[in-house]
Amino acid sequence: MIRSVVRGMGAALPRRIMKNADFEGMVETSDEWIVQRTGIRQRHIAADDETTASLGEAAARAALANAGLTPGDIDLIVLATSTPNNTFPATAVEIQNRLGMHHGFAFDMQAVCSGFVYAVTTADLYIRGGLAKRVLVIGSETFSRILDWNDRSTCVLFGDGAGALILEAGEGAGTIADRGVLAASLRSDGVHKDKLFVDGGPSTTGTVGHLRMEGREVFKHAVGMITDVIEATFSAAGISADDLDWFVPHQANKRIIDASAKKLGIAEQKVVVTVDLHGNTSAASVPLALSVAVADGRIKKGDLVLLEAMGGGFTWGAVLVRW
């Protein structure tokens, strides 16, 4: 059977690093307050010349170099983002052009922080359906553009960045020992749409708007939703938490990460955490964390890796991959 096998990874971060202490003169907060509640110590913030497209392009080029491929080898680009360069055309098309790729097709996917997990699942379906042999999956965000910098409950949480992964068609035996995407589960429930949202848009206010969040409400639902979708993914693959080599969760809040891992029985040493370095980068969160763990040698060929994310909507999901 056809499997979607990981061929390469890449990442890109804005030049500017903003430490927690930098917020102390802007809003009523402190490094201690932020670290205690979120685990975040710093985040990268895009300069005027750094955009979702430019960061996505840089991550894509890094992934291509890592895979030993060129843009000509890619059939499809799927970009997960909630902060596109323009309302239209899709920022994926702009990245396609920046890469000099004038064949195949490209589109954006919007599932907020769950975007990359949704995008990997979608890319897998295109590959297994025979419509693409190699897919460049990108998560790229510039959330700093939609933050209310006077709202201490949100402005300290988010950062900018991009990560990319290349999937390619490979042969598998149809067992859990296969390399590639092995199982996935996706969920959404719009009843929660007002708990995490942006208060603007072209069809409503004609403005970009700012991010708004009911933090306690998000936390209240997060752990249960995350563990349920992961357990569904385990069931689909016929495995348990003990079989995992690595858990790469959405990097939103260290307390949510810890509580989810504990509830699932995943050992702390198997959890990849980069929220302290990047903050919450929405759809870029999971591929950035993946890139760190691949680059430092933790994730190796043959490892069983679980990706998970939850975002506004609510949307949430999990993907199981044999590296």
UniProtKB/Swiss-Prot annotation:
Residue segments, region ACP-binding: 251-255
Entry-linked Gene3D superfamilies: 3.40.47.10
A Pfam family: ACP_syn_III
Keywords: Acyltransferase, Cytoplasm, Fatty acid biosynthesis, Fatty acid metabolism, Lipid biosynthesis, Lipid metabolism, Multifunctional enzyme, Transferase
Domain of life: Bacteria
Cellular component GO terms, alphabetical: cytoplasm
Record carries keyword DNA-binding: no
CDD domains xrefs: KAS_III (cd00830)
Localisation per UniProt entry: Cytoplasm
EC number(s) per entry: 2.3.1.180
A GO molecular function held by the record: 3-oxoacyl-[acyl-carrier-protein] synthase activity
Record-annotated active site: C113, H250, N280
Catalysed transformations (reactions): malonyl-[ACP] + acetyl-CoA + H(+) = 3-oxobutanoyl-[ACP] + CO2 + CoA
GO biological process: fatty acid biosynthetic process
Broad class of where this protein is predominantly found: cytoplasm
Pathway noted in the entry: Lipid metabolism; fatty acid biosynthesis
Domain remark in the UniProt entry: The last Arg residue of the ACP-binding site is essential for the weak association between ACP/AcpP and FabH.
Subunit and partners: Homodimer.
HAMAP family: FabH
Annotated function: Catalyzes the condensation reaction of fatty acid synthesis by the addition to an acyl acceptor of two carbons from malonyl-ACP. Catalyzes the first condensation reaction which initiates fatty acid synthesis and may therefore play a role in governing the total rate of fatty acid production. Possesses both acetoacetyl-ACP synthase and acetyl transacylase activities. Its substrate specificity determines the biosynthesis of branched-chain and/or straight-chain of fatty acids.
Family note: Belongs to the thiolase-like superfamily. FabH family.
Name this protein carries in UniProt: Beta-ketoacyl-[acyl-carrier-protein] synthase III
Native organism: Mesorhizobium japonicum (strain LMG 29417 / CECT 9101 / MAFF 303099)
Name of the gene encoding the protein in the UniProt record: fabH
